[in-house]
Amino acid sequence: ISVYRFSANGAVAAISCRGGYPVYMRKTGKMGDFILEYRQALDKAKRYLEKIGLAGFKETYYFTDEGVCVINFAYLDGRTVCYTDLVKVGVAMDSGEIMLLETSGYLSNHTDRAFESPAVTIEKAAEKVNKKLKIRNMELTLIPTDSGGEVRCYEFLCETEDEQEILIYINAVTGEEERILILLKSDGGTLVK
């Protein structure tokens, strides 16, 4: 994405040359004591996205580092969570100020998609999940492929016998397993491996 870069008052920003969309913004500064809870930071991030014209997103994962809670949002296309179309928003946990915005995933990948009904039902896809795992949640998703494309999958949030959470992605067209991710939870948030 070609951008115009700006900097002032401890912040840097980039606006796309085509369309004038915000591509990224980062502010620096010393963070004070945490006064916000995650839900408050999430609310501020959602309101910020709406303010800049980015609506229709679902929060996915977050982590807090050096006083900033960075929340990942995926575009919601009908009932499909599009992980390919990601936006990140960072909220200062001491003041609620927006410290980070990254939209390049969304700007690079978002397009109007005409999703057809999945060839494989969610029940058939669930049969592919190992029976030793407890399925806690299921939803339709669009995930990136290693080759730069995208594939529509059912996402199964599962739990192992030792309470480790994992995500299993089953292709909604072929019924084959596409990917397995491990959820890494800590006091600072949740990341995937």
Report the location of each language-model feature:
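Long, terminal "pre-/pro-" and other extracytoplasmic accessory regions
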Residues: 1-193
